[in-house]
Structure formats: structure tokens, C-alpha cells
Amino acid sequence: MAKLIAFDQDAREGILRGVDALANTVKVTLGPRGRNVVLDKAFGGPLVTNDGVTIARDIDVEDPFENLGAQLVKSVAVKTNDIAGDGTTTATLLAQALIAEGLRNVAAGANPIELNKGIEAATQKTLDELRARATPISAPQEVASVATVSSRDEVVGKIVAEAMEKVGKDGVVTVEESQSLETTLDITEGISFDKGYLSPYFINDTDTQTAVLENPAILLVRNKISSLPDFLPLLEKIVESNRPVLIIAEDIEGEPLQTLVVNSIRKTIKAVAVKSPYFGDRRKAFMDDLAVVTNATVVDPEVGINLSEAGVEVLGTARRVTVSKDETILVDGAGDAEAVEARRQQIRREIETTDSTWDREKAEERLAKLSGGVAVIRVGAATETEVNERKLRVEDAINAARAAAQEGIIAGGGSALVQIAETLKAYAEEFEGDQKVGIRALAAALSKPAYWIAANAGLDGAVIVARIADLPNNEGFNAATLEYGNLVDQGVIDPVKVTHSAVVNASSVARMVLTTEASIVDKPAEETADHGHGHHH
């Protein structure tokens, strides 16, 4: 495939045009008076949204050189969304401003390497300032404020806060479509996994087609149970104690399974057998989690516990277990609260130390399962278009609330960034030459979110930014009420984690663009057919 190559100024200008194409589309959505963007979808109706990352993902630019720029900024939005789940519009805007400001200086003869050193120093200073300004939050109304700002909907804010309060900041909050017009919240306490009963003969509640066990003995086995002589001694002890039993093992086959089924039909025993979920190390880790939650010991020959010799002391219990054909839910396990908390801390350490995204995601899932219940927010609306739009906002709100609970909040509306920009201008005086220029470039970029929030409200952004710069910490401009004041008290707040990742990702992409000397793209095929040569402007 033939390539087209553009060098220095041409390459950078092409990239900047692509950056602008994407960022200008996204920035109209910023702030309480921001607008929506309509996306044409190949399937179903058009999607109306103000979610930055959803819009960014949809944009590809025709000119291949410009498209490089668009894709680079798209990566800022996507990465910010992956880390913090919100703040994608702010990140896109910061990247655009920083790239434009930086390229202007490069065109005027600044050294890109020195500029980058300045931007890097300024980024670090900004992060330090953000941390210094952070206010920790815990009260439900503070969480509700964060969620309300993110979703622009008070009802959603309250529901998200309630969900977080019930399941904790590490708990699972899922979003589903509601069958009604109302948006509602359901909480299920306990730990669940996606495996159901091995035989429908275990069902004892025919209305719901589930097996329900009250205060059962819970037997956890690391390997397969395939030998009846090994299994029978422990099973007989359980039958003698007159308790129902839940058995979770890698698999239960042959005679042991037949024995359980036959005795369940005869009602001599109330039992359910379930395969353990996942594979390999994940399965092992999850079984160990279950053991802690239910106060059981996993039967595992590797650690010297054989099924044939195991006594009732290996059994755990829970208040209630419900098993459907594809899910098992254990409610109120008998595990010691301190042991469960120690297990959570161990998983948190794994999350912090692992380099693999996949491992981290799986560990986060385990942490969420261990952190108590599962909250389900069912989103209702009159039309499918509206439901989809609202679901995106609810997901943003959950992410924002979680981020705020983790790292605290700052004044929203871009105000904190404007004030940090003032600090950067003073900080720049400690540097020389192009490094100083780099620090000033980030300072200029940091005022852009506040500028566009004001501009989207139909006001003069420059005037408002100048006024915010003189205000003390936590004060700024509220674009919803069009008044200045203490934004934290008014509930106009941003999670530090969201702003933090927006700044880091924008700075990272801008530094890459500033040091770009050439861009290479595939030569468009139809051009060769028509003219025998590619052209580029």
C-alpha cells in the first residue's frame, strides 16, 4: 500500500485540524447549559447525547492526515473514561487547547523538547494543587451533588447516592432498562456468581423455578467430586444434622450427583450442587473468597484436606441461598466481618500492584462481590432513544460519584482549574526559556473548560475567566444560576480523580503531538484510480 507523508509544519497543522474537528463537536456539550449532539446510528434510531466519549468514539475525519489528530484526541477521551468514567469533554478540551497553544509556539521557533519539559513540570504542579484543594466526601447529599452535576438530573443524583450508600463505594451498581417510566433502585445483599444448579431436580420452589435453602451447610470443594466412597461419609454426617446443603465444586458427576438427585426426589435431603465459576487461578481465588464469606474451609488435597476424611468443621453457612438455572446468590454469609475486611484489603493491594489491566479488572470484580450487595438502577423513559440517553448519563453519574468517594472533590465549573492556572503563571517565573513557555501553555489551556461552560451559556468566556481567577478557593461561576459564589456549598463540584485523569491524559497526548516531525498515512485508493497520484493540501 502506497503511503503519503507530511513533514513538520504541514504534519502538525493537519493533526491540529483533526483535533479541532473532534474537540469542537464535543465542547458544545460542556456545562449545565451545554447542548446535545445527534449521532446517526447504523442500527436503530439516532442517538441524542451529551456524553463526550460517546460522541468522540463516533467521529472519523475524511482527510487521513486530519484523522490522525482526531484519533489522538479520541484516545484522550477514551482513556479518561476508562480511568475515571467521566470528564471526557474536559479532557478533550484541555488537549485541544494545549496542542493549539504548543503548536503556535513551535511555529514561532520554540524548541518542542524544552516546551514538553515545561508542560510536564506544569502537569505535576497541577496535580499537586488538585490534591491540596481536594475536599473528602462521604455524606449522601455530597455524593448526590456529584451525581447530579454529572447527569444534570436531581432524581438520578439521589438514586445514585442511595445506591452507593447501600452497597459501599466499591460495591456493584448496575444499570438496566426499566419496564416502566420510573427510574428505580433495587438492592440485593450478598455475593452472587453466574452458575446455576447441575440438575433441575434440585428445584424446590416451583413458582420461581429456583432452589431455595435456608441456613444450609455449605461445602466447597476445589476439585471434581466423582467418587461416591470419598463423598459419602461427609454427606451422611450432613444428613444426620438435618440441614439442607449447598455443594460447590469444580464438577460433580457420576454416582455422587445421582445420589444427591435421588435423595432430593425422595426428600431425604434438601441439596443443591453447583459448579464453581471461572477457570484456573480465578476459580481458585473466588472459591477462597466464598470460604471467607461463608466461614467454610475449601476441601483441597493440595493443602492436606481430603474429601474422604473431611468432617463437618469444613462446612460454612449463610442465612439464605437461592439457586436458579444460571445464577447462585448467597445472602448473609456466616463469615467473620474482620476476616472479610482483611480479604478485601488483600484484593485492594493486588489491584494496586498488578500491571495487567485484565487482572486488575478481575480483582476489582472480586472486590465488588465481596463489598456487599449489588445495586440495580432500572432506568425508565418514554422512548428507547430517551432510555439510551438517560442510561449513559446514569453510568456517568455512578462513575463520577465513585471517583469522588475515592479521591474527594473540588469546585466545579472549571473554576478550580482557572485558579490553578494563576498558580502556574507564578510558578513559571522559576523557569527559563521555552520551559517557561510550556508552563504558560498549560496555564492557558486550564482556563478553557470554564471559558466554554460560560460561552455555552451565551456569555463572554474571557470576562468570566478573568473574574474567577481573582476568587478564593472553592468559589467560582455557577452557569446554571448565572451567579458567582461558593460552588462547593451550591453542589457544583467535580471529582478530583476525574479532573486529575483529564489533565494527565491531555498533557500526555499534547506532548506527543508537539514532538511530531512527520505523519504517514495510507494513500487513498480512489485517488489513484482517478488521477494516478494522491494529492494532499
Swiss-Prot record:
Gene Ontology CC, one term: cytoplasm
Listed transmembrane segments: none
Localisation per UniProt entry: Cytoplasm
UniProt: ATP binding residues: T29, L30, G31, P32, D86, G87, T88, T89, T90, G413, N478, A479, A480, D494
Alphabetized PROSITE patterns for the sequence: CHAPERONINS_CPN60
Entry-linked Gene3D superfamilies: GroEL, GroEL-like equatorial domain, TCP-1-like chaperonin intermediate domain
EC number: 5.6.1.7
Catalytic activity: ATP + H2O + a folded polypeptide = ADP + phosphate + an unfolded polypeptide
Listed GO MF terms: ATP binding; ATP-dependent protein folding chaperone; isomerase activity; unfolded protein binding
Coiled-coil annotated spans: none
Keywords: ATP-binding, Chaperone, Cytoplasm, Isomerase, Nucleotide-binding
Highest rank taxon of the organism: Bacteria
One of the Pfam families matching this protein, by short name: Cpn60_TCP1
Entry's family note: Belongs to the chaperonin (HSP60) family.
Subunit comment: Forms a cylinder of 14 subunits composed of two heptameric rings stacked back-to-back. Interacts with the co-chaperonin GroES.
Cited function: Together with its co-chaperonin GroES, plays an essential role in assisting protein folding. The GroEL-GroES system forms a nano-cage that allows encapsulation of the non-native substrate proteins and provides a physical environment optimized to promote and accelerate protein folding.
Name the record gives this protein: Chaperonin GroEL 1
